[in-house]
């Protein structure tokens, strides 16, 4: 807002700048929609809560990708059931994939055994009474595959319900809860503040729920909503973003769409590669794709596809290419773009072995490091001395307790 005030001038104190999660958090706390002592937990703390129920080492789970992914599925499933209970439209479900085909088959088998109809209410009822259905996996004549499906589902339901109950009893919210609770409140309360002017950046990154919240925030009479997005970036479906989001907005904003057609940075030969991919793989209209005003011609080996037989050889070949480019012109810089932080770490190690100086931009967000989380926890308790999660982080951070689970139990006993 300081930058906006310098450019535009005037009073900008009423201007809200932030992502959808930030707006939801600000709304819930400042409008007293949740208890004053509520606290927001991150993924690490959510895993710690479930690990405590499962009597597993929370740090061991965090270090093991497959186990961590299983915990995430439990968390996602809890949100799935919440949305089912609150009758959210299917297109707004955050994690429909958490209710797998195997889960559906398991539910159908339980319903068949119990002689009840298979529907949403059956799913919700079994979820809330999962332990009462464990014997369904031992029904005589039931094949082993279906029995395993039932066991996996019921344990997932049980721990998801435990996670939900723990959050409710301790006034905790995870990041998805911020969206879900804000959506529910705005959907039913006409007195909530609506906004006449809204600007949404990186709209291709929004999932259906986030877009629905923005719609609920908008006044009905003559609103001005500006969406800024990039169709070529709408490929990150693992984040919940989809090309369909932009397609929906294009239909909604028909006649009021402006395309930025000129790319001033990339040479034409490189931009053509990305445009061809966008047209043929993402099915984006060629007329909507940018053109370059940099018509420099490609030199030999400017565009190359290098085949590697193994991951290790790929890392070595990438390192060799980067080193050759550096030796050809030490004034130029080379960027190596990878798909994950672990890939960056491995390539960095390979470059270190051959003495190739480089700067690695990857790793965990600074604000998720233990030291920064500990610092922010101190500030949090100054603002709200009843913030139990902040106290838990402090007690774990100063090594008063070896785990978040023990620190949480101690805080609970102090209440």
Model-derived segments and spans:
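Helicase P-loop NTPase motor core
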Residues: 254-256, 262-357, 383-384
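Conserved ATP-driven helicase/translocase motor core recognized via long
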Residues: 58-62, 76-153, 158
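Conserved P-loop NTPase-based nucleic-acid remodeling module centered on helicase motor cores
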Residues: 2-103, 247
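Extended, charge-rich low-complexity interaction segments
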Residues: 47-58, 290-300, 388-413
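Short glycine-/polar-rich loops that comprise or flank the Walker A/P-loop
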Residues: 11-14, 220-224, 230-232, 252-257, ...
């Amino acid at each position: 807002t300081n930058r906006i005030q310098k450019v535009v001038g005037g009073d900008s104190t009423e201007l809200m700048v932030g992502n959808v999660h930030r707006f939801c958090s600000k709304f819930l706390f400042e409008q007293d929609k949740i208890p004053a002592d509520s606290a927001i937990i991150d993924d690490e703390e959510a895993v710690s809560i479930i690990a405590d129920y499962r009597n597993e080492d929370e740090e061991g789970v965090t270090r093991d990708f497959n186990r961590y992914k299983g915990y995430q599925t439990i968390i996602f499933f809890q949100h799935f059931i919440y949305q089912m209970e609150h009758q959210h439209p299917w297109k707004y479900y955050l994690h429909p994939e958490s209710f797998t085909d195997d889960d559906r088959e398991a539910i159908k088998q339980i319903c068949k055994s119990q002689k009840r109809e298979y529907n949403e209410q059956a799913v919700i009822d079994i979820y809330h009474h999962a332990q009462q259905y464990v014997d369904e996996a031992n029904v005589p004549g039931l094949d082993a595959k279906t029995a395993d499906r039932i066991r996996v589902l019921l344990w997932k339901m049980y721990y998801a319900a435990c996670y939900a109950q723990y959050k409710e009893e301790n006034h905790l919210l995870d990041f998805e809860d911020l969206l879900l609770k804000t959506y529910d409140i705005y959907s039913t309360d006409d007195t909530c503040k609506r906004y006449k002017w809204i600007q949404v950046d990186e709209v291709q990154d929004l999932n259906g729920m986030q877009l629905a919240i923005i719609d609920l925030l908008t006044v009905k009479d003559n609103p001005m909503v500006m969406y800024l997005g990039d169709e070529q970036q709408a490929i990150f479906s693992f984040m919940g973003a989809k090309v369909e989001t932009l397609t929906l907005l294009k239909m909604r904003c028909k006649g009021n769409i402006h395309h930025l057609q000129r790319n001033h940075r990339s040479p034409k030969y490189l931009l053509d590669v990305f445009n061809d991919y966008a047209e043929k793989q993402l099915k984006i209209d060629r007329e909507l794709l940018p053109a370059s005003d940099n018509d420099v011609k490609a030199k030999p080996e400017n565009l190359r596809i290098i085949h590697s037989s193994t991951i290790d050889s790929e890392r070595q070949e990438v390192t060799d290419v980067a080193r050759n480019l550096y030796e050809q012109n030490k004034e130029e810089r080379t960027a190596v773009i990878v798909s994950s932080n672990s890939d960056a770490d491995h390539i960095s190690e390979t470059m270190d072995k051959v003495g190739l100086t480089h700067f690695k931009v990857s790793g965990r967000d600074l604000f998720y490091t233990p030291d920064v989380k500990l610092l922010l926890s101190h500030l949090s308790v100054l603002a709200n001395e009843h913030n139990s999660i902040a106290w838990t982080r402090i007690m774990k951070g100063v090594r008063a307790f070896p785990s978040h689970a023990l620190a949480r139990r101690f805080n609970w006993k102090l209440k």
